[in-house]
């Protein structure tokens, strides 16, 4: 059953009722006025408490923001100090490593020089021993040859003269 707007207007009519008593307008105004009067304090109290809670939350949030900002600044300061300390430690470590490397190089050079001196001393000692051995062998060979040739070269007169000179040299 569909009814159209023109049908409703034609049969029932459309009009505004301005009769205050029939429309309950007075009752509505009274009820609304009483609700506003009595609920004003109730709703106002609720809204005031809510406002105070929001303000307290805002104040707490601001305090936490200030605290967090201070903590952040302190953390950044400590981070900068830690970076500075780390850079100093790194620089000292590099310097110490360079000193250790230089000391190691110096000790290596000194040890090489000492080994070279020891080798030269050993070589000189061995050369002196070989020279002494050669001298002794040469002297022994010369003495042997001289002793072998001596009987052929010496006669009795020269032998006696040699003995006399040797005795005088000793004596």
From Swiss-Prot:
One of its GO terms (molecular function) is proton-transporting ATP synthase activity, rotational mechanism. InterPro entries: ATP_synth_B-like_membr_sf, ATP_synth_b/b'su_bac/chlpt, ATP_synth_F0_bsu_bac. GO terms for cellular component: plasma membrane-derived thylakoid membrane; proton-transporting ATP synthase complex. It is a single-pass membrane protein. The chain crosses the membrane at residues 26-46. Pfam families: ATP-synt_B. The keyword Transport applies. Keywords: ATP synthesis, CF(0), Hydrogen ion transport, Ion transport, Membrane, Thylakoid, Transmembrane, Transmembrane helix, Transport. CDD domains: ATP-synt_Fo_b (cd06503). Its main location: membrane. F(1)F(0) ATP synthase produces ATP from ADP in the presence of a proton or sodium gradient. F-type ATPases consist of two structural domains, F(1) containing the extramembraneous catalytic core and F(0) containing the membrane proton channel, linked together by a central stalk and a peripheral stalk. During catalysis, ATP synthesis in the catalytic domain of F(1) is coupled via a rotary mechanism of the central stalk subunits to proton translocation. Belongs to the ATPase B chain family. This is ATP synthase subunit b. It comes from Synechococcus sp. (strain RCC307).
